[in-house]
Amino acid sequence: MPTFDTTKQIFLCGLPSVGKTSFGQHLSQFLSLPFFDTDHLLSDRFHGDSPKTIYQRYGEEGFCREEFLALTSVPVIPSIVALGGCTPIIEPSYAHILGRNSALLVLLELPIATLCQRLQHRSIPERLAHAPSLEDTLSQRLDKLRSLTSNAFSLRAETSSEAVMRDCQSFCLRFLSTKESSYA
């Protein structure tokens, strides 16, 4: 039976609709660690306003500042943290993540076509709403995220509980495995 290192603060980044929040919640339960979502923390700071509303009100620069403040409000403890789609791309936020002891930044991935399909059924983030080509913009952003971390993990497009649990196990085996435990 493998054992997992639960002393890390795991930051999940990825494109919009990849499943950072959903997977992060399942992973936190799987590992019995607290879960934080910077989008939810940001909304809480603005009495429930959505990130889209906050972006419209403050523009790109103001929104980035607020994303950074939401990130800095996350306690430095072993936990799972779902980052807003652009949070790690913002230099102060990226430096803040890397400056934390035992931080692990992991890029969650799904095929761009799957993400475009998901975004068609949801609200497209304000940063992407006026992009000439959603697919090209997502591809460029994915390249930028890939340049920030060599830790990438491909999720399954399937969202059943069983599939998510398999993803949690695979994730832990890949990034958090310590050694085999013997119960003899």
From Swiss-Prot:
SUPFAM superfamilies membership: P-loop containing nucleoside triphosphate hydrolases
UniProt-listed InterPro entries: P-loop_NTPase, Shikimate/glucono_kinase, Shikimate_kinase/TSH1
Residues that, per the record, bind ATP: S17, V18, G19, K20, T21, S22
Biological processes per GO annotation: amino acid biosynthetic process; aromatic amino acid family biosynthetic process; chorismate biosynthetic process
Cellular compartments per GO CC: cytosol
EC number annotated for this UniProt entry: 2.7.1.71
Annotated catalysed reactions: shikimate + ATP = 3-phosphoshikimate + ADP + H(+)
Cofactor(s) listed: Mg(2+)
Cofactor binding note from Swiss-Prot or TrEMBL: Binds 1 Mg(2+) ion per subunit.
Top-level EC class as recorded in UniProt: transferase
Keywords: Amino-acid biosynthesis, Aromatic amino acid biosynthesis, ATP-binding, Cytoplasm, Kinase, Magnesium, Metal-binding, Nucleotide-binding, Transferase
Residues the entry annotates as binding Mg(2+): T21
GO molecular function annotations of the record: ATP binding; magnesium ion binding; shikimate kinase activity
Positions of substrate binding: D39, G85
Annotated Pfam families: SKI
Pathway where this protein functions: Metabolic intermediate biosynthesis; chorismate biosynthesis; chorismate from D-erythrose 4-phosphate and phosphoenolpyruvate: step 5/7
Source superkingdom: Bacteria
Intracellular or extracellular location(s): Cytoplasm
The UniProt record lists the keyword Cytoplasm: yes
Family per similarity comment: Belongs to the shikimate kinase family.
Assembly and binders: Monomer.
Functional description taken from the UniProt entry: Catalyzes the specific phosphorylation of the 3-hydroxyl group of shikimic acid using ATP as a cosubstrate.
Protein name: Shikimate kinase
Originating species: Chlamydia trachomatis serovar D (strain ATCC VR-885 / DSM 19411 / UW-3/Cx)
Gene of this entry: aroK
